[in-house]
């Protein structure tokens, strides 16, 4: 295959990747988007094989690698629960980072195989690209592993605050930059692996002080890192498809991180610095009447059965309890009684971007019933019931009304404007921000304390009587 034709094929795969992103932007076109991505990746792999013209032995290894990787991917995809998607995404990001490190190491030890020079005489530009790719890849690898452990509950989701962490991180970052300069000048293998070690450590230290509920930003941020790592290695290899794909993933992840931060009214830097929710925050919650109106499943069933409009607000509590199917059953029961049902999604609800959308899609909730914050917030005032299931800080009126609150200014779902707010939660404990939710103590709120799935199931049963 000629290089010109290969460049054209890579360009076609890049266009397909762009179409895939566009398709994945809406649930109704997500399957089509996935198909575009699969075709684009197939073209990129086939083009690479035809361009490289590997020997029979190398081809066997390549096919074996594709079979093992594809088989493992298919196995995981079939067995993974939708509630574990955040962990899966973080795990995949770690593999992208690891791949960038391994490819960079291979290029360092066998530069002639990659067309970037000979041992001891690697092109300076290739060394810079390789160094950046391996540094970002190593940070992505360990950062994603920490994110996986936090999301999977194998590590505390609370911020882990080390003394002088900012100074240590800054020193490590400066050290990596200096070592990259030394590597470009000396091509030392020892310096290369020292960059890897420092970057691996930096990845851990950057993520451990970030609280579990900031994970939507972290996941999209690591997604961006993995893209830039791939793009860096793409430049080293002179692979157009890898450069295009890496740039697409890197830029889309960065944009998504910005959107997530905007949804929390926080700067990207404040999230990366971490520590949010590490201590009990103060606010007006100490001065308000703490009387709580607690209800039962039967009370909730009566209110919903006599409502004309119900807006359901899912949050992380729904994901933990795996209550999405029970929620769909409740919605079906309400619609059978001529009750209008809609779902309201906050952009940072859950532990990854689109977490609630994924869970509702698994339960076959119709797409046209699911609305984003800006599209449905004005409708709460006309709703008879807002059924909040484990969405704490994203419904806290203090973010709207209390200038002294740490979350003041964060866009929230105005569930308190509904005639009645039914709030399902295990306890009256604070959310990740460490502050009381003033919604609990409002006259129009009825607390339904207990497991989200069991409570929803009990409401459905009560509606049958």
PLM regions with names:
Residues 248-307:
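Membrane-interfacial segments at transmembrane helix termini in multi-pass membrane proteins
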Residues 48-63, 75-84, 101-119:
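Transmembrane alpha-helix boundary signature
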Residues 53, 106-120, 184-190, 217, ...:
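Transmembrane helix-loop junctions at the membrane interface of multipass transporters and ion channels
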Residues 286-465:
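Structured cytosolic domains appended to multi-pass membrane proteins
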Residues 16-29, 70-89, 144-159, 202-215, ...:
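C-terminal ends of transmembrane helices
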Residues 1-14, 51-70, 126-141, 187-198:
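Structural signature of hydrophobic alpha-helical transmembrane segments
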Residues 211, 225-257, 261-269:
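Mobile "lid/hinge" segments at catalytic clefts and subdomain interfaces of large enzymes
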Residues 31-40, 62-64, 84-96, 159-170, ...:
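Cytoplasmic-side transmembrane-helix entry/capping segments in multi-pass membrane proteins
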